[in-house]
C-alpha cells in the first residue's frame, strides 16, 4: 500500500521547486511538475538516511499547494509561505527543528573539513543567478552557506550580533530563534522585503539551504574523484551513497 507524502510547489512556469512537508528541508526540482514529482521518493529516502531513520518506500506524492511566483524558481529562488508554515508549533516540534539544523550544520562542516581541494574551481558551474555568480569551489559554497545564516535570522529579527566561527554563528541564530519562539510560538507572520515569513519557515529554509548547497559541494567532490584528483570524499547527507 502506498503512503501519501504531501508536497507544496512554487513555480514561475520555467521551473518547479517542491517542498516535502513531512521532511523539513527536503525538496525536489524539475522543469515540469511531473519531473519534480518523479524525484520525491528518492529525495525522501536520502533525507531519512541522513536522519538515521529507516527509509519509507512506495511513497505517493500529493500536491497540496501551488504558489505562482515571478522569481527565478529555476535557480531555486523561493518566496513561498507554506500553509504548513503558519500552523501552531508545539515545543517538541520546535526542538526537533533545532536539532535538525544543528545536525545539518555538522554535516556541512564534515564535508568542508574533509575536503582536500577546497579552492579547486569547477568551471562548468560558472553562471549568473539571481544572487550573483554561482560559487564554483567548495570554499566559496561554504562561505555562501555561512553568510546566509544571519540572513535567515534577519527575516524575523533586527537585533543581531556578529559572532566568529560557522558553528558559533549557527548556535547564536538558534538561540535567538528560540527566544522568539518562546515569546510568540509560531503565531506571527513577518513581512520583510515584501516576503512573508514565520518562525517555522525560517527553520525550514535553514535546512533546505544547507542541503541544496551541500549537494553542490558533494557534486564537486564526486567530479574530483572521477578525475582522479582525490581518492575519496565525505557525503554525510547521503546524496550519492
Predicted regions span which residues?
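Acidic/histidine-rich alpha-helical segments that form the ligand environment
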Residues: 87-115, 161-190, 197-216
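Short, contiguous alpha-helical
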Residues: 7-15, 23-29, 39-56, 120-167, ...
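Short secondary-structure junction/hinge motifs that connect adjacent elements
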Residues: 57-64, 121-124, 187-189
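Short, charged, surface-exposed hinge/linker loops at domain edges
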Residues: 2-4, 45-94
